[in-house]
C-alpha cells in the first residue's frame, strides 16, 4: 500500500472517507465508505463539487496503483520455476542467486563490506538438505475481472438508461449461476433462458415476456450476489448473442427449450417485447389545425373530439354533402379516440395552435403580400365549394351583390382600389377612413373587406394603458379594422365622446408604416413588425389634421332608406351573415371583374364560378334584384315567396 499513494494523498483520501489512518489498506471498508461519501458529496444531492472531484481522483488513483502493484508482484513471482532452482551451496546456485537479485529495486541492495572472520576448522562439509521456497505458480485466467469482450458488440453499453427491454444477459460465478438460473426463470417467467460456461464463470441469457429496465434485473440479481461479482447487460442483438455463446470459448450448459433459440422461430414481440400500444399523435392534430387554419384551442378540441364518433354513425358523413369532412373524419378517427381518453387534451391542442401561429408567422415573413392575398382567396374558394351549394344559396349571395351595388354604384372599382392599397402597403398610404352617420353601411362594408383579406378588428376606444395588448392582436395579421372610433363631440351633439381619435393621434407610427413597431401579447415576447394596413370606421366626429393626413382616402357614407328596407324584407342576408362574409365580396369581384384581373393561380377557379353564376342567374334576373333594392323591396321577391 506504501507504493500506491503518497503520504499526503493517503491522508487526504482518508479524511474525505472519514476513516482513521489505521484503516488504511482495508480496501473493502474503504470501498463501502467511498460509495457512501459519493452520495454525500455529489452536487445533485447538495454536496460539494470540489470534494467530489478530489475524492474520485484519489480513489481512482488508488485503484490503479493497487492493480499495478499486484501485476508487478505476479511477474516477479513467476520469473523462476521451482525446477529451475539449483542445489544450494553449489556454484550453479551462486550464479542463480546473483541473477535473481538483479530484479530487486536498487534501494534494497546493500553494498557494505563486512570484516573477514577467522575460519573455523570443521569436520568434513556435508551437503545441505534444505531448499529455497519455490515461487508461486502462475494464476489461471480469471474471467470475473470483466465482461467477455467477444460479446460486447451484441449488448448495450448504456450506464444509466430508463429504456425497457425484454432481453438480458447476466455474468457471474459458477455457484451463483446455478442459483440465478432458477431464480430468474421463476421470477420473470422467461420465455427462453440458457446458461453458458465461460472459463471459471457463467453467463445466463434470457428473454422475458414483458419489458423491464436493466437496473431492475441488476437489483434483483444483486440480492443473491452480495459478495460474488455480477455484470448485467441489456441485449441489442438477441440471436447474435445466443449464437456466439454457443461457440468457443463459451460452452452451452443448459436451456429451457430443447434445441435452443432459432432465428426464425421467435416473433418480433418475443425478442423485442409486446408491440407498442398506439399513442396519441400530436402531429396529426397539428396538421388538422393547419389545414383548416384553426387558432382557437377550444374550437380545435371540440372539433377534433367529434371525430371520435365512428364515421358510419356520423350524420355529416352519411349525408355525403361534404366530401372533405368525410375524408378528414376517416383519417383522424383513431387519433380522436385516443385524444378523447388522453389526460393531456388541452396541451396537445395548444401545441397544434402554436404550429398554426408559427406557420402564419413564417408566411408573413417570407411571402409577398400579393402571394398572401392569393393564398387567402384560395382558402375562400375552398369554403365556397362547401357553402355556396344549390340554387337558394347562390341567389342569396347574388342578392348581397345587388345590395352592395345599391350602396355604391362603382362598388367593384372601390374594392379593387382598396385591394391595391392593401397589397402595395406604401408608407403613409395604407389606411382608408369610412365616415358617416349611424346605420349607413360603414361597418358592413368594412367587415366584408376584412373577411375577404383576412385580419382582425380592434377597439381603440379604451384607456391608453390598455392599448399595447389590444394592438398586439394585430401580430401576423394581413390587415386590421379600427372599428367605430369615437372622438370629441362635433356637429352631431348626440354622439358619445371617447378616446379613440386621441389614441389614433398617438399611433402615427402604426398608421404610417414607415418604421417597425413593438407588438406584444400576454405570455409572448414583444416582436417588431410593420403594423398592418387597414380601415378606420367612425361616425361624424371631428378629426384633427394630424390624423386626417394619414388617410389615403376618406369614403363618405349616407343613410339610404331603401337599403335598410330591403334588408328588413330580406332577413336571410343578415341572419346568415352573408353581407359580412368575404365570400360575398369575392363573388362580387367574380361577377363584375374580368378574369385577367385575378392572379394566374386562381383564374381557373374564377372561370368555374363565373360559369356557375351564369347558369343560375342572368343579367335580367340580376337587374330585377337591383330594382328591388332601389324600391326597398324583398330582393328575392321573384324567387322566394
UniProtKB/Swiss-Prot annotation:
Extent of motif LXCXE motif: 108-112
Residue ranges for the DNA-binding region feature of this UniProt entry: 148-263
Zinc finger intervals, T-ag D1-type: 277-369
Residues in SF3 helicase domain copies: 410-572
Compartmental location: Host nucleus
Sites where the protein binds Zn(2+): 314, 317, 325, 329
Annotated positions binding ATP: 436-443
Assigned keywords, A-Z: Acetylation, ATP-binding, DNA replication, DNA-binding, Early protein, G1/S host cell cycle checkpoint dysregulation by virus, Helicase, Host nucleus, Host-virus interaction, Hydrolase, Inhibition of host innate immune response by virus, Inhibition of host interferon signaling pathway by virus, Inhibition of host JAK1 by virus, Interferon antiviral system evasion, Isomerase, Magnesium, Metal-binding, Modulation of host cell cycle by virus, Nucleotide-binding, Oncogene, Phosphoprotein, Viral immunoevasion, Zinc, Zinc-finger
Catalytic activity entry: Couples ATP hydrolysis with the unwinding of duplex DNA by translocating in the 3'-5' direction; ATP + H2O = ADP + phosphate + H(+)
Enzyme Commission numbers on file: 5.6.2.4
One Gene Ontology term, aspect cellular component: host cell nucleus
Function as written in the Swiss-Prot or TrEMBL entry: Isoform large T antigen is a key early protein essential for both driving viral replication and inducing cellular transformation. Plays a role in viral genome replication by driving entry of quiescent cells into the cell cycle and by autoregulating the synthesis of viral early mRNA. Displays highly oncogenic activities by corrupting the host cellular checkpoint mechanisms that guard cell division and the transcription, replication, and repair of DNA. Participates in the modulation of cellular gene expression preceeding viral DNA replication.
Protein's recorded name: Large T antigen
Amino acid at each position: 500500500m506504501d507504493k500506491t499513494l503518497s503520504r499526503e494523498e493517503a491522508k487526504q483520501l482518508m479524511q474525505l472517507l472519514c476513516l482513521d489512518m489505521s484503516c488504511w489498506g482495508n480496501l473493502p471498508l474503504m470501498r463501502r465508505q467511498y460509495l457512501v461519501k459519493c452520495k454525500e458529496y455529489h452536487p445533485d444531492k447538495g454536496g460539494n463539487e470540489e470534494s467530489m472531484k478530489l475524492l474520485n481522483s484519489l480513489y481512482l488513483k488508488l485503484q490503479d496503483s493497487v492493480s499495478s502493484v499486484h501485476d508487478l508482484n505476479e511477474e516477479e513471482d513467476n520469473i523462476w520455476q521451482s525446477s529451475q532452482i539449483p542445489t544450494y551451496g553449489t556454484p550453479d546456485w551462486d550464479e542463480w542467486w546473483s541473477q535473481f537479485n538483479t530484479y530487486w529495486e536498487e534501494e534494497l541492495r546493500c553494498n557494505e563490506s563486512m570484516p573477514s572472520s577467522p575460519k573455523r576448522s570443521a569436520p568434513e562439509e556435508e551437503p545441505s538438505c534444505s531448499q529455497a521456497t519455490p515461487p508461486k505458480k502462475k494464476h489461471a485466467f480469471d474471467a470475473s475481472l470483466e465482461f467477455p469482450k467477444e460479446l460486447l458488440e451484441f449488448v448495450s453499453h448504456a450506464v444509466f438508461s430508463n429504456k425497457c427491454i425484454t432481453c438480458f444477459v447476466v455474468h457471474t460465478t459458477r455457484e451463483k449461476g446455478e442459483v440465478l438460473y432458477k431464480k430468474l426463470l421463476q421470477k420473470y417467467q422467461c420465455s427462453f433462458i440458457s446458461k453458458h460456461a465461460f472459463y471459471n464463470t457463467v453467463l445466463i441469457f434470457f428473454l422475458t415476456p414483458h419489458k423491464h429496465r436493466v437496473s431492475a434485473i441488476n437489483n434483483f440479481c444483486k440480492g443473491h450476489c452480495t459478495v460474488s461479482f455480477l455484470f448485467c447487460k441489456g441485449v441489442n442483438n438477441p440471436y447474435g448473442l445466443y449464437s456466439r455463446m454457443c461457440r468457443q470459448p463459451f460452452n452451452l450448459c443448459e436451456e429451457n427449450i430443447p434445441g435452443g433459440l432459432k432465428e426464425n422461430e421467435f416473433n418480433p414481440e418475443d425478442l423485442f417485447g409486446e408491440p407498442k400500444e398506439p399513442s396519441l399523435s400530436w402531429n396529426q392534430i397539428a396538421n388538422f389545425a393547419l389545414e383548416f387554419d384553426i387558432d382557437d384551442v377550444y374550437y380545435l378540441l371540440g372539433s377534433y373530439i367529434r371525430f371520435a364518433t365512428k364515421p358510419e354513425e356520423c350524420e355529416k358523413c352519411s349525408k355525403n354533402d361534404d366530401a372533405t369532412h368525410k375524408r378528414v373524419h376517416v383519417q383522424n378517427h383513431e387519433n380522436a379516440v385516443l385524444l378523447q381518453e388522453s389526460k393531456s387534451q388541452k396541451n396537445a391542442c395548444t401545441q397544434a395552435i402554436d404550429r398554426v401561429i408559427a406557420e402564419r408567422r413564417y408566411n408573413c415573413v417570407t411571402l409577398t403580400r400579393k402571394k398572401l392575398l392569393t393564398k387567402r382567396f384560395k382558402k375562400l374558394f375552398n369554403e365556397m365549394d362547401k357553402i355556396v351549394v344549390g340554387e337558394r344559396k347562390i341567389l342569396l349571395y347574388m342578392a348581397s351583390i345587388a345590395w352592395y351595388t345599391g350602396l355604391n354604384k362603382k362598388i367593384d372599382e372601390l374594392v379593387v382600389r382598396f385591394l391595391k392599397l392593401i397589397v402595395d402597403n406604401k408608407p403613409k398610404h395604407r389606411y382608408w377612413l369610412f365616415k358617416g352617420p349611424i346605420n349607413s353601411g360603414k361597418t358592413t362594408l368594412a367587415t366584408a373587406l376584412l373577411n375577404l383579406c383576412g385580419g382582425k378588428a380592434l377597439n381603440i376606444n379604451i384607456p391608453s394603458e390598455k392599448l399595447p395588448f389590444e394592438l398586439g392582436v394585430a401580430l401576423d395579421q394581413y390587415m386590421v379594422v379600427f372599428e367605430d372610433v369615437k372622438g370629441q363631440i362635433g356637429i352631431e351633439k348626440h354622439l358619445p365622446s371617447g378616446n379613440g381619435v386621441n389614441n389614433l393621434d398617438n399611433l402615427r407610427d402604426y398608421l404610417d408604416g414607415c418604421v417597425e413597431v413593438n407588438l406584444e401579447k400576454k405570455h409572448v415576447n414583444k416582436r417588431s413588425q410593420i403594423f398592418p394596413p387597414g380601415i378606420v370606421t367612425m361616425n361624424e366626429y371631428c378629426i384633427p389634421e394630424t390624423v386626417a393626413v394619414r388617410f389615403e382616402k376618406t369614403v363618405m357614407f349616407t343613410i339610404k332608406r331603401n337599403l335598410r328596407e330591403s334588408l328588413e324584407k330580406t332577413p336571410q342576408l343578415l341572419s346568415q351573415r352573408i353581407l359580412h362574409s368575404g365570400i360575398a365580396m369575392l363573388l362580387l369581384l367574380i361577377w363584375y371583374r374580368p378574369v385577367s384581373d385575378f392572379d394566374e393561380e386562381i383564374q381557373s377557379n374564377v372561370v368555374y364560378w363565373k360559369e356557375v353564376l351564369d347558369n343560375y342567374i342572368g343579367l335580367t334576373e340580376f337587374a330585377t334584384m337591383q330594382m328591388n333594392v332601389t324600391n326597398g323591396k324583398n330582393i328575392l321577391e321573384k324567387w322566394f315567396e
